[in-house]
């Protein structure tokens, strides 16, 4: 639509030292483009009669990102189990950005390439097999993403500065058909604005997101370690698991968005819309 000609060169390299075969290093770089889609082409403006109209911006350009990524993986054994520690650091120089704001559940785009910015951070993740064939993991991330709108530096709508997550699964002693899993998340709140306002006019952050889920699953049909094939109707199934979960175990009220109320003095107040509280779930998983 905008008649752009794009070239996206990319390169990556990996290295495993002979003296440390359990360590793998990698580096990647490249120039990436994101072509605009319909909602980003919409350019609102006011005509001579004061009516707001929408036109399509044919001169808009693709958003561009130059990326540098450095990572490493290290495998080892502990407690008689295999583990892998992964780490990654990245920097992304962003240009020709199309700013957008989130109004409750609606995303409103500026319709023009008005800003530039960056995203940088580090990620760490530890994998481990406490249960053979099933990964448990622990992750931690730090990130900063910022853009310049009209000479004012503001966080991007996805600026979640920290995040911690875990997933752990294990069997009960002497009950190999009964499996327990635990999931937890703690992450920073996202930037928020009042309706019809942009972040360069002011913003605030939602509270941190916190959630813990637990689950139990019982194997009604599990693979036979001896390799003996089942007979009858059960021979059609590889495994059947019946499980029960408690989502948001601690009943934490996490904020999803805000509903704005205006009083007679034209002052706006942010009323939080909360996500689902504690919830129970029953599931049946069948593998053929």
Region annotations inferred by a language model:
Residues 1, 29-35, 42-45, 74-76, ...:
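Transmembrane beta-strands of outer-membrane beta-barrel pores
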Residues 1-24, 46:
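Signature of Gram-negative outer-membrane beta-barrel scaffolds
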Residues 5-7, 64-68, 116-120, 158-164, ...:
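Residues that define the transmembrane beta-barrel architecture of outer-membrane proteins
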Residues 11-15, 70-74, 122-128, 138, ...:
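Residues on the lipid-exposed face of transmembrane beta-strands in outer-membrane beta-barrel proteins
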Residues 16-18, 26, 30, 40, ...:
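Membrane-embedded beta-barrel scaffold of Gram-negative outer-membrane proteins
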Residues 18-23, 77-83, 133, 173-178, ...:
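Short loop/turn motifs that connect adjacent beta-strands in outer-membrane beta-barrel proteins
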Residues 90-93, 110-194:
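Gram-negative outer-membrane beta-barrel transporters
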Residues 133-136, 185-195, 218-288:
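C-terminal beta-signal and adjacent terminal beta-strands/loops
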């Amino acid at each position: 639509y905008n008649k752009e000609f794009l070239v996206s060169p990319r390169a990556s390299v990996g290295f495993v030292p002979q003296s440390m075969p359990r360590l793998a290093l990698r580096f990647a770089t490249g120039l990436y483009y994101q072509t605009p889609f319909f909602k980003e082409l919409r350019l609102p403006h006011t005509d001579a009669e004061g009516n707001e109209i929408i036109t399509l911006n044919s001169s808009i350009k693709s958003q561009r990102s130059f990326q540098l990524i450095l990572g490493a993986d290290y495998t080892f054994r502990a407690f008689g189990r295999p583990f892998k520690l992964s780490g990654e650091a990245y920097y992304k120089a962003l240009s020709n950005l199309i700013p957008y704001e989130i109004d409750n559940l609606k995303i409103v785009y500026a319709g023009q390439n008005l800003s530039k910015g960056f995203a940088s951070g580090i990620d760490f993740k530890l994998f481990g097999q406490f249960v053979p064939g099933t990964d448990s993991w622990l992750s931690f991330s730090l990130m900063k993403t910022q853009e310049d709108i009209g000479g004012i530096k503001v966080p991007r709508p996805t600026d979640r500065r920290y995040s911690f997550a875990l997933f752990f699964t294990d069997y009960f002693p002497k009950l190999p058909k009964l499996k327990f899993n635990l999931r937890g998340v703690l992450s920073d709140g996202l930037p928020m604005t009042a309706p019809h306002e942009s972040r360069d006019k002011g913003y605030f952050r939602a509270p941190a997101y916190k959630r813990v889920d637990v689950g139990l699953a019982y194997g009604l049909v599990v693979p036979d370690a001896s390799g003996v094939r089942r007979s009858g109707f059960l021979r059609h199934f590889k495994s059947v698991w019946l499980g029960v979960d408690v989502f948001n175990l601690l009943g934490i009220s996490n904020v999803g968005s805000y509903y704005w109320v205006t009083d007679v003095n034209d002052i706006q107040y942010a009323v939080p819309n909360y996500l689902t509280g504690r919830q129970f779930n029953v599931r049946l998983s069948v593998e053929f």
